Amino acid sequence: MKPLHSQYQTPDISLPFRQLQKHIPFFHHISKQYFLHHISFCFSPYRKINNNLEQQTQAYFDELFVVNADPNWPECTLANIGSVVAGGTPSKSKLEYYADQGIAWITPKDLSGDKSKFISHGENDISELGFSKSSATKMPAGTILFSSRAPIGYIAIAQNEVTTNQGFKSVIPNKNIGTAYVYFLLKNLLPTIEGMASGSTFKEISGTAMKSVPTVMPDADIIQLFSDFCEPVFKEQEVLEAENKHLSALRDSLLPKLMSGEIDVSELDL
């Protein structure tokens, strides 16, 4: 059986516009509005498949660790599940602390604008010098980024080595725990974490409080069962998100050309 994403062909934005026509199932003689509407329509299959996969994995987590949770599983805290890591911000007044292609540096704003499950870079990267002059910490791929303030609870999975600003209390999963379990565990614990937050201006969960969030330690074989189930699903979701971003880039590259009249779609034979 072909991977789900292979059922849909993604346009290559490097192709000449005439060649792009054959990739997109539009009708003849269309308006700009109709053209843009159908580019937006192309996002739908990827989103639906991705959402369905997310619902399946969430349901399996609930089945294993909520509905059928073993009352004999020992109590523990997040500190027993993985390493809780804070972040830092290099001085904004030092331009040399930032780079176009440097160390990935994520802020809550990056997660608010991009609802993807996986993230590789934010709007800005920092330089090695900026990293050395801040309290930012390098975290490996598979780390679960968790925003700790304004708001609490943005969650994403690092696709590569990343750093964050101080608006995160991220979790590097222990090797015997794995990314998938910690990702869904944090989603499940969000009400508890919000209840442990404090602050007069805005609520924030401190590093100490985050480490002390209560949970349980399921049997290792159950965690492994869940990890094995999630591994191919997560890989599929990464591909779907990449293809969705590719379509977004296509739309964004064509929009100004359509609006300026550089591209005329009214007489295209699609």
Predicted regions and their residues:
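Ser/Thr/Pro-rich low-complexity tandem-repeat tracts
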Residues: 25-26, 31
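Non-catalytic DNA-recognition/assembly elements of restriction-modification systems
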Residues: 6, 16-18, 31-33, 38, ...
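DNA target-recognition domains and sequence-specific DNA-contacting regions of bacterial/archaeal
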Residues: 1-21, 25, 76-218, 269
